[in-house]
């Protein structure tokens, strides 16, 4: 039986997180708070006016882009900062000022972490596969909720960082397998082995390279990978979550791809975008929200 495809998109907001806030936005930038640090980063879609322009000049860290591929440099108002601890629920991890304007995680993903937490806590020690796991926050959130996690990323450095975050969280002994591998190759081997999972998470980049030079292109490679992931879902599987950052994509297109991959599993497909919202009215202007990522998720019920 085909899954039921939601006819309306959802906008999922990151809320109630003491270690993160979107303070203001406008003039192609966003002002955020990470722990005790205020950070100003480019955000071209914020073409409205800031609510408090003077606050932009007081940021602790400012990212200056050098090219269209998001590379650039950080400026600091005081002593340069490399990394700093943050927390979300039971998970602890390091934010880091990377040369690619982000801080080694993506705060809008907290809406997905919250959803995963609820799904996993309703299950009995489910096996969860996290592909393109990066620095491991989603893997740690899943493990904290009770899952046995397999974390896969093509970058040895990212996997080492994820393991450091596990130690920081006091989860060094948690049931997490750390795998450095190309996601497509790993999933293909798992299909041949007959492995099964109750939940799978995918957060692929638009473009990337595997540990031995494999090239990943989202639009060319995602359909086959998602089909293989659907084959890894056990009979009692609970979810398959796909997230993507790409200008030429939409939540609806991801939903149709998900429907194709899960065509015989029943259940439901929800889709939409992840967004950050300014945390409160300021200077007479209500909070604005910034859509940053698209998602589609299949759930058994």
Walk through the language-model features, giving the residues of each.
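Non-catalytic substrate-recognition/targeting regions of SAM-dependent transferases
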Residues: 16-32, 39-107, 114
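Conserved alpha-helix/loop element of class I SAM-dependent methyltransferases that forms part
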Residues: 107-124
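Conserved SAM-binding loop of SAM-dependent methyltransferases across substrates and taxa
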Residues: 135-147
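S-adenosyl-L-methionine
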Residues: 155-201
């Amino acid at each position: 039986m085909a899954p039921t495809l939601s006819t309306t998109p959802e906008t999922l907001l990151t809320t109630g997180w003491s270690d993160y806030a979107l303070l203001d936005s406008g003039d192609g930038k966003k002002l955020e708070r990470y722990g005790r640090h205020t950070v100003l980063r480019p955000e071209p879609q914020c073409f409205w006016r800031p609510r408090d322009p003077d606050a932009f000049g007081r940021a602790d860290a400012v990212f200056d882009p050098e090219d269209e591929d998001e590379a650039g440099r950080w400026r600091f108002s005081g002593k340069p900062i490399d990394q700093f601890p943050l927390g979300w629920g039971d998970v602890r991890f390091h934010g880091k000022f990377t040369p690619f304007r982000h801080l080694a995680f993506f705060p809008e993903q907290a809406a997905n972490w919250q959803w995963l937490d609820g799904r996993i806590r309703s299950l009995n020690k489910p096996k969860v596969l996290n592909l393109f796991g990066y620095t491991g926050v989603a893997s740690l959130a899943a493990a904290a909720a009770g899952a046995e996690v397999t974390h896969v990323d093509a970058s040895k450095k990212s996997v080492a960082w994820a393991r450091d975050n596990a130690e920081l969280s006091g989860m060094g002994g948690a049931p997490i397998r750390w795998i450095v591998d190309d996601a497509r190759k790993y999933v293909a081997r798992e299909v041949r082995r007959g492995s099964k999972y109750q939940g799978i998470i995918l957060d692929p980049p638009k473009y990337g390279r595997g540990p031995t030079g494999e090239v990943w292109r989202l639009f060319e490679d995602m359909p086959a990978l998602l089909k293989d992931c659907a084959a890894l879902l056990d009979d009692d599987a609970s979810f398959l979550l796909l997230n993507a950052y790409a200008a030429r994509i939409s939540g609806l297109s991801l939903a149709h791809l998900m429907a194709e991959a899960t065509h015989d599993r029943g259940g439901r497909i929800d889709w939409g975008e992840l967004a950050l919202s300014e945390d409160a009215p300021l200077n007479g202007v209500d909070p604005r929200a910034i859509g940053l990522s698209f998602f589609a998720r299949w759930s058994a019920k």
